[in-house]
Amino acid sequence: MHDNLPQIWEKAINLIKTELTEVSFNTWVKPIQAISLDNETLVLGVPNDFTQGILNARYNTLISNAVKQVTSKNYEVHIVVPSEERVGDTQNINARRSNAQSPIMGNSPLILNPKYTFDTFVIGNSNRFAHAASVAVAESPAKAYNPLFIYGGVGLGKTHLMNAIGHYILANNPKAKVVYVSSETFTNELINSIRDDRNVEFRNRYRNVDVLLVDDIQFIAGKERTQEEFFHTFNALHESNKQIIISSDRPPKEIPTLEERLRSRFEWGLITDIQPPDLETRIAILRKKAQMENIYVPDEVTAHIAKKIQSNIRELEGALIRIVAYSSLTNSEVTVELASEALKEIFTSKPRLLNVPLIKEVVSNHFSIKLEDFDSKKRTRSISYPRQVAMYLTRELTDLSLPKIGDEFGGRDHTTVMHAHSKIVNEINSDSDLKNKLDAIIKELKSD
């Protein structure tokens, strides 16, 4: 770093400040950190890709001119999103990330996300038990709960907790071999190993570890060879007293076409779920996001967003970034009115996300059956009829193909789905009670 860089940058931002509104300056320029300055190039660090894009598009020339005024020299300005260890006083994180990457062979398994730690996880009633279980496993791998199975909808924090477990273990035991992988990557690596006759290398990669974290395990359902390989991998690790952490969008008993021997093993340890966050947790998540990204958003605005968006954390955070961008691009103060304007398309046009687990849940409540009955082989009318109704609704309200719908209902053939759909369509015309019941179910599914 140039010895005078802090002084040069301080003078430059004072000049920049006179050219911008307070909102724009605080949102885009204030978070910038001066990283290095050589004979030709000034490197500036920003907290995220979004900020980088805005600065490059709108403010790069302004920054260059300000630096030129201070130094009487033309510098090329590079705006980057540095790895976490280069921003601020985080030397320990540098060591941890090196260790996090060391056990990962090639470029196949995933690298732990440095932002996903226990410190950045917002705890609420919807995720408190899952968080506590994750901490327990991180503190005592293979001693507390093995395996740990975390399930929940998209964007609720499963991946965050899995990364946090990996980071915590590595921070306390830098020599630990931690591998984090998606089930899709596991499958692709298996296929490649079979093709290239490298089965031994593949098995060593996933069986000679201390901690194995597998994301989205539901995608191995229906893949016989993958399930076979994962079954033996699971056994090898469990017998060696190594920790296994698994995530899914549903509990083991509701994963269609999952082999029973795997299902039973997933249930050996602890199964915990994450629910959509309540209002207080959503507000806390937004405040944490604003703090992490160094952006200012009034409390009444975060409360407004939290009341309007109830689905998942990703949409909450996306709405926050959209509002801040809208504020900057229109040179307007962040207010509730501005937030409503920025998000009006989301609020007015986005329907509730419909999926099979939600449809099953609502139908099971209306017909008083258990969720597992949808995937069972039971053929009594009290079970088969609600199952047909759920298949009909899935066909009508989602974009899933007939074979995929069959998979979601215990691995049934697509012709079974076609029959169920046709049966309900025909009965609607002659059975007013059924039509009224379906209308009530659909209304509940589409309600906020």
Curated annotation (Swiss-Prot):
GO terms (BP aspect)? DNA replication initiation; regulation of DNA replication
Q: Which superkingdom?
A: Bacteria
Q: Which SUPFAM superfamilies match?
A: P-loop containing nucleoside triphosphate hydrolases, TrpR-like
Provide the protein's localization. Answer: Cytoplasm
Q: Which UniProt keywords apply?
A: ATP-binding, Cytoplasm, DNA replication, DNA-binding, Lipid-binding, Nucleotide-binding
What SMART domains does this protein map onto? AAA (SM00382), Bac_DnaA_C (SM00760)
Quaternary structure, from the entry: Oligomerizes as a right-handed, spiral filament on DNA at oriC.
Quote the HAMAP family the UniProt record gives: DnaA_bact
Q: What is this protein called?
A: Chromosomal replication initiator protein DnaA
Q: Which organism is it from?
A: Alkaliphilus metalliredigens (strain QYMF)
